[in-house]
Amino acid sequence: MRLIRMLLPVLALTTLTAHADDKDVARLTQLLETSKTLTANFSQLTLDGSGTQLQETTGDMTLQRPGLFYWHTNAPAEQTMVSDGKKVTLWDPDLEQATIKKLDERLTQTPALLLSGDVSKISQSFDITAKEAGGVIDFTLKPKTKDTLFDSLRLSFRNGLVNDMQLIDSVGQRTNILFTGVKANEAVPASKFKFDIPKGADVIQE
């Protein structure tokens, strides 16, 4: 399974408190709710616990509340992941294979839903702290349960728009995602979140 799948099945600060700060939760919720749709390009870098690069990819994404997302990773590790709000389709053109599964609405299992899902559930799922410097607001999210894809997630905003995301897993592997060309609240066609599986492709239902 490719490392890119860690983010979407398709994104730490050290000063933490034991419980979510109400002001930090409210601020993060406001920033997220302001963007009903998001489009952006991204570059993703994954490092192991010692800092060795494991993978570097680029691509583009489109998100829309509630629960809709399109995430395309460019070649050579090309993949497309699309959610219609109920199910997620992962298309691997190299394998000519489509994997279809029910959308896991838990924010700790599907980080993309932090940007496209029900933000009212954030404080139920995470302890949250915020830090602001140089016009950038960093939110650190620590899952409240152990059954998660990551141990820590940092979400950063610049000028009111998401700027980057970092996930750290239990073995110290880091996935850093930088978003560029971010645009919010532009009209997105419904067809963006529907994936037509090519004829003859292998289909796996999970």
Curated annotation (Swiss-Prot):
Name the residues that span the membrane: none
Q: Does the keyword Transport apply?
A: yes
Gene Ontology, cellular component aspect? outer membrane-bounded periplasmic space
Fetch the Pfam families from UniProt: LolA
Keywords on record: Chaperone, Periplasm, Protein transport, Signal, Transport
Which processes are annotated in GO (biological process)?
Answer: lipoprotein localization to outer membrane; lipoprotein transport
The family database entries (SUPFAM superfamilies) matched by this protein are listed as: Prokaryotic lipoproteins and lipoprotein localization factors
Name the predominant localization: periplasm
- Would you say which domain of life the source belongs to? Bacteria
Q: Does the keyword Membrane apply?
A: no
Renumbered to this chain, the signal peptide range is: 1-20
Where, per UniProt, does this protein localize? Periplasm
Matching entries from CDD domains are given as: LolA (cd16325)
Matching InterPro entries, A to Z?
LolA/LolB/LppX, OM_lipoprot_carrier_LolA-like, OM_lipoprot_carrier_LolA_Pbac
Q: What does this protein do?
A: Participates in the translocation of lipoproteins from the inner membrane to the outer membrane. Only forms a complex with a lipoprotein if the residue after the N-terminal Cys is not an aspartate (The Asp acts as a targeting signal to indicate that the lipoprotein should stay in the inner membrane).
The entry describes its oligomerization and partners as:
Monomer.
Q: Which family does it belong to?
A: Belongs to the LolA family.
Query: Under what name is this protein listed?
Result: Outer-membrane lipoprotein carrier protein
Q: Which organism is it from?
A: Pseudomonas fluorescens (strain Pf0-1)
Query: What gene is this protein a product of?
Result: lolA
